[in-house]
Amino acid sequence: MKNLHVWPNPSGRIFPCRSTSRTLSHVRFVHPPPPSSVRCHSSLTQHPFRCAVLGAGFAGLSVVWHLLKQSPKELNLRVDIYDEVGIGGGASGISGGLLHPYSPKVKLLWEGAQCWKESMELLRAAEEASVSKDYRTEESAEHMEAFVAHKRGILRPATDMKNMIKLNENVKTCLPSCRVQTLNNGEAQSLLPGVYLPFNTAFYMPEALNINSRHYLQALFRGCEILAKESSTLDSSQKQLSLHKRSVHRLSEFEGEYDAVIVCLGAKVNMLPELSGRLPLRTCRGVIAQLELHDDMKGYPERGPSILSDAWIAVQGPHSLNLGSTWEWKSVNSSPNVSSDEASKALQELLPKASTIYPGIKDWVFTGARAGLRAMPPLTTLGSLPLLGCINDVIGRNHICKYWLFGGLGSRGLLYHAWLGNLMAQAVLSFNEEVIPSELRSWKATEPKCNVLF
């Protein structure tokens, strides 16, 4: 990933100037305003710029990575991560891990090209960390070896005539870096023997990935640790990173201790009294079933793709797969544990959907289940977009721009987290909310008042 170029300035701050384009690739950097219009919170020789990141899932770790990556070399930086269950212990860690930039109708999502590009870059950074000699431990060697090893692609069968016509139209605008190929039944059978195509057509994304989300997040955190260590060695400043496994009960706990507090708590954001009931988020619990095949049976094809349909199948190995996911709206249950009754209901819902496309799944045996609570954003004309921005006006602290929200990733956290984490880090380091596209700030009732430059 390339470093963002900034001109050196005495305060060590970066001041982005928004261009007419809404994408990150067109954000340009200019000299800071004259000293008379800038109120420095501290000099580089005094205390470090202190950031608290609440949450260690997709959103939180992406922000941490980009804060470390983008911060000026001369800036002393301290980043503290707070998460009661540790790295990837929430909904991010149990997500299905199917990564691609398309809607169910194979239409490129809003800013899908940028999201896909930056996700690939962050995945590469985590992969590099996973093989680094600074990373290897007895615990990590077994689990982190290949969290992106399942490069099988993803197959989406057409399930009705109306759907198929729309899919065929959208295929024409797919990304060159994540192609969508139209397959007939024979071609699909060569990839995955036994797959059933109701309309003799399927859409195959060969570059789409199947990520082990929790292992990826653990590798990304290690990458952040390595980056902080290397930056402190090579630069004239100190970059400090710490993980605190403890609960956060209210934002006021951080008042006066940090220069920026970035809330990346997913569905748990409503547990903060300052934000409870004030965000346009809906909660939805999803259960994922874990299935295995007896060793003496022929396994899933080595290069067989994962499947997206009314239920999805994320292949973990020839004799292991994950099946998901249920949608229990308005749930407040964030526990990853699944009762036998909840698991039974999930299987009753998911297996018939999956067996319609892949009948062979009936031979697989249920071995366990896990669940997560999603924070779903409102639907807009551009789709369901995450919520980003300064929240001082929301929580009643308008004196300085220091409290930030990065939430509402819903079921697309793996796709959105890299690019939006990049944007959030820029906004935090520059104290300028305008870095964030207006589409991601439109959830706020009034125009933000958090454009203070320090």
Spans of model-derived segments:
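Glycine-rich FAD pyrophosphate-binding loop
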Residues: L68-G93
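Active-site lid/adjacent beta-loop-alpha segment flanking the redox-cofactor pocket in flavoenzymes
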Residues: M297-C401
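Helical element adjacent to the flavin cofactor pocket in flavoenzyme catalytic cores
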Residues: Y196-A260, C264-P273
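C-terminal catalytic lobe of FAD-dependent flavoproteins
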Residues: G360, W364-F454
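Central helical "cap/lid" subdomain
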Residues: R246, R250-I307, P336-L347, G360-W364, ...
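Dinucleotide-binding Rossmann-like beta1-alpha1 core, especially the glycine-rich loop
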Residues: G96-L191
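Beta1/beta-strand and adjacent pyrophosphate-binding region of the FAD-binding site
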Residues: S43-A59, D80
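N-terminal chloroplast transit peptides
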Residues: M1-F29
